[in-house]
Amino acid sequence: MKLRQLDMELFGGCNYSCSMCPQGSEKGRERDFKKALSWLNFMKIVDDAELHGVESISLHGGGEPTMNKYFIPAIKYIKNKNIQCTTLSNGYNLDDNLIDEIIDSKIDIFKISVVGYDEQTYEKMMRTNAFNKVRENVKNLVRQTEGTNTRVQSQHLILDPEKKDYEVEQLRKNWIDYTGIDAEIWLMHNWSGVYEGKYERSKEDRRGCGRPFQPMLQVRAGGLGKHQGAVVACCMVLGNDAAATLGHLDDQTIEEVYNGEKYQELRDAHKEERFDDIP
């Protein structure tokens, strides 16, 4: 089998508790999935992915990757295999020392997640009074990576679709122009389930996304029980990882999971449009 992309979580916990994320919900993220991926399991998974011709590995998931002590060694391990490497962070830990290490790692793309267009909305959504701190961290990262292999990007979410134009204007003024960063702006995600109506999916008009048939895998740092490296259906199952687990790469190969019974059941349910049969 050919594997094009591997999304791999290094750390299942987080130093933030954002309102739109299960990390910040009353229930919180499932305990089994808040682990740090071990170095041995990380190497096993990357080596296996390399055998399947993986083109890109993104170190992100539902936690903060910089909290894994092997964050920089993980990037270097991937880059030494000539595989594209990307990560997504909240940017809080980007001090001068980490920035130097990031540049030295030669990571291809470093993405920053920022929800909120000013100090007040950032604190409301990300539940941390760190808008200015992160903004300065990222401005420094952008400046120091100029002329290097590393591209720095930010990802933002619209808080109120009715005020989209205003929010884009504020993001441009308070964030994009200030830091000099390239940015993506998306509609709000609702992983935590705390928002009403606007993003509900109609049960009368459903279709498969096609992800179960794509040459890509979504891997969590944690797993059921003592396992690590759980393969889940997609990134949108965050908060329900246990029900979405298709196998574990700490004691299975990528091919065993991808061609396994649970993965095939998921594909069959999509093909036959039996969406209520999907946990």
Model-derived segments and spans:
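Short beta->alpha connector loops
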Residues: 90-94, 116, 159-162, 189
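Short beta-strand segments
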Residues: 7-9, 22, 58-59, 87-89, ...
